[in-house]
Amino acid sequence: MLAITQKSPAKINLFLHITGKRVDGYHNLQTVFRLIDLYDTLTFTVMDKAIGSHLPIQLVSDNPVTEQPTDNLIVKAATALLAFAKNNALFTQAQIAQLPLIDIHLDKKIPMGAGLGGGSSNGATTLMMLNTLWQLGLNKKQLCQIGASLGADVPIFIFGQDAIAEGIGEILTPITLPSQQFLLLKPDAHINTAALFQHPNLQRNCTHFDHTRLSQQRQDFCDILSPAFSNVFEPVVEALAPSVATALTYLKSLSTLTGTTPRLTGSGSCVFLPLPLTGSRHVPADMLSTWQHQAPTPSYIVKTLARGSPDRQIF
């Protein structure tokens, strides 16, 4: 049996703006995504039996990841890819029945509901790996289109590099940014994303910045956030989830030493503080260890993934 193990990374949003509402009822966003070295691990094993009329994969995880297996983005990704192949005459029904069953084992490390995109990353990794194992030959653009139908954060993990994201998150433009390190805190809070979008205090009319400004003025949103940049969900989540407010307060107490701006990532519960890699504000390892020990929530030290990282070279 052939077995391939693939890392599935998390992401953070350096800022997150809503720039208006679309005619389809969704919101237009503008954000900058960074991929980080916090991973789930997926192992794809090609079994010695055909799928027949069953689902093309079987998912195994050491920890339950959704109440219903069919709600998991790994399962949804496999189902969507198979449907795309069938609808575009890449497979006949007879060929589909002869495809080998793929066993997918998920080792879950990325916290769920954190705004780190763990489920979306798993879905993206599944699309890319099954595209290879089934020899479909789809390109990144096609896989991103399938991914966008599964969730707004899925395409960035197929894109595989730092990017400006617009639309609902599916319009991606590469951006070159310096390496960064972060202290992440994960409060124990469940955030209902749909409720956030409906919240009366949510800012929905942010300025849309052109790409030239974002590329040339990255100092306004990387280590610090200038007044023009924010995560619009942050004040709403703080008000709804006291544990998130506590975590942000803790990071703000550290920011006097780092000179950086703590913030929320995505629309989840995870917050982070950029850590200077060089200079007088560089935080030594023993101090970082103390900060983690004193943190009011589980914590992680992570770094950004370099463009072209081997962890994303699936094609």
Where are these regions (language model features)?
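Conserved, helical-rich catalytic subdomain that frames metal- and/or nucleotide-binding sites
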Residues: 157-159, 164-261, 274-278, 282, ...
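ATP-binding N-lobe of GHMP and related small-molecule kinases
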Residues: 1-114, 132, 136-141, 186-188
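Short, basic/glycine-rich phosphate-binding loops at helix/coil junctions
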Residues: 51-67, 126, 148, 220-231
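Contiguous, small/hydrophobic- and glycine-enriched helical/loop subdomains that border
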Residues: 127-164
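Glycine/serine-rich anion-binding loops at beta->alpha junctions
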Residues: 105-134, 152, 261-275
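Short beta-strand scaffold segments in enzyme catalytic cores
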Residues: 40-44, 153-157, 163, 271-273
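Hydrophobic C-terminal alpha-helix "anchor/cap" residues
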Residues: 33-36, 147, 251, 291-292
